[in-house]
UniProtKB/Swiss-Prot annotation:
The modification Phosphoserine is found at residue 244. Residues 110-155 are annotated as: Intermediate domain. This is Myeloid differentiation primary response protein MyD88. Adapter protein involved in the Toll-like receptor and IL-1 receptor signaling pathway in the innate immune response. Acts via IRAK1, IRAK2, IRF7 and TRAF6, leading to NF-kappa-B activation, cytokine secretion and the inflammatory response. Increases IL-8 transcription. Involved in IL-18-mediated signaling pathway. Activates IRF1 resulting in its rapid migration into the nucleus to mediate an efficient induction of IFN-beta, NOS2/INOS, and IL12A genes. The intermediate domain (ID) is required for the phosphorylation and activation of IRAK. InterPro entries: DEATH-like_dom_sf, Death_dom, MyD88_Death, Myelin_different_resp_MyD88, TIR_dom, Toll_tir_struct_dom_sf. It comes from Rattus norvegicus. Homodimer. Also forms heterodimers with TIRAP. Binds to TLR2, TLR4, IRAK1, IRAK2 and IRAK4 via their respective TIR domains. Interacts with IL18R1. Interacts with BMX, IL1RL1, IKBKE and IRF7. Interacts with LRRFIP1 and LRRFIP2; this interaction positively regulates Toll-like receptor (TLR) signaling in response to agonist. Interacts with FLII. LRRFIP1 and LRRFIP2 compete with FLII for MYD88-binding. Interacts with IRF1. Upon IL1B treatment, forms a complex with PELI1, IRAK1, IRAK4 and TRAF6; this complex recruits MAP3K7/TAK1, TAB1 and TAB2 to mediate NF-kappa-B activation. The gene is Myd88.
């Protein structure tokens, strides 16, 4: 927090902090933020005021009130939303006249951010050149050489992904949340989402087969009532299962994200699912899914 960035009141926030995700802040800083913001007082803005500025609605704030550490829960929930960053957090605290927090924690925040940047740079320097993570990933036919937005048109360096997302158009909002939680956070996974990543003009069945078998290490199936009516999803699921008989390679991961009126598909019942509808395990949902997708 120096003189080099946007100014809010008497506080100047370094511009680079707006590009850092909230995961850059370590446990110590978060605990100190809780000590400042958890107490309810009329003398200064508390965590509820911050939650409103972050865009959370009344019922969401009431849910945070039931948590032992509402500030921690608030930060965990906000860091998965678009627009969240270290810089934006500091900006909101300044707007709420909580400059006392900024002055108290500025050195520790700066230290966390610099450490995060160094770790990211180290990971990038140690990362090998992109190689095929799935055997035989080079397309065998020219028409499958340029099927995704970042593909080499000549087919020499095909775009690779951590997971193919099998979903119905009606479930796109949950898929977008998946993108925010898994790609735009510290997990930094790379998902293949057809509506975003696949170029038009090629047979959908050929594209799906190529991506699932040769470009993606896993496949996530977003199961819903509409999924059960989709011939395309049915093909993708059965094709993925055929590549891993008995699910020995943990290739396919079913997700149930909302209540269903119809029975869960029988071909997926023998696979452990990620259940977003279970309130008791919802807080672990994204961590479990991310770790499953990160397995070698």
């Amino acid at each position: 927090m120096s003189a080099g960035g946007p100014r809010v009141g008497s506080v100047s926030v370094d511009s680079y902090l707006f590009s850092l995700p909230l995961v850059a802040l370590n446990v110590g800083v978060r605990r100190r933020l809780s000590l400042f913001l958890n107490p309810r007082t009329t003398a200064a803005a508390d965590w509820t005021s911050l939650a409103e500025e972050m865009g959370f609605e009344y019922l969401e704030i009431r849910e945070f009130e039931t948590r032992p550490d509402p500030t921690r829960s608030l930060l965990d929930a906000w860091q998965g939303r678009s627009g969240s960053s270290v810089g934006r957090l500091l900006e909101l605290l300044a707007l709420l006249d909580r400059e006392d927090i900024l002055y108290e924690l500025k050195d520790r925040i700066e230290e966390d951010c610099q450490k995060y940047i160094r770790n990211q740079q180290k990971q990038e320097s140690e990362k090998p050149l992109q190689v095929a993570r799935v055997e035989s990933s080079v397309p065998q036919t020219k028409e499958l050489g340029g099927i995704t937005t970042l593909d080499d048109p000549l087919g020499q360096t095909p775009e690779l992904f951590d997971a193919f997302i099998c979903y119905c158009p009606s479930d796109i909002e949950f898929v977008q949340e998946m993108i925010r939680q898994l790609e735009q956070t510290d997990y930094r996974l790379k998902l293949c989402v057809s509506d975003r990543d696949v170029l038009p003009g090629t047979c959908v069945w050929s594209i799906a087969s190529e991506l699932i078998e040769k470009r993606c290490r896993r496949m996530v199936v977003v199961v819903s009532d509409d999924y059960l009516q989709s011939k395309e999803c049915d093909f993708q699921t059965k094709f993925a299962l055929s590549l891993s008989p008995g699910v020995q390679q943990k290739r396919l991961i079913p997700i149930k994200y909302k209540a269903m009126k119809k029975d869960f598909p029988s071909i997926l019942r023998f696979i452990t699912i990620c259940d977003y509808t279970n309130p008791c395990t919802k807080s672990w949902f994204w961590t479990r899914l991310a770790k499953a997708l990160s397995l070698p």
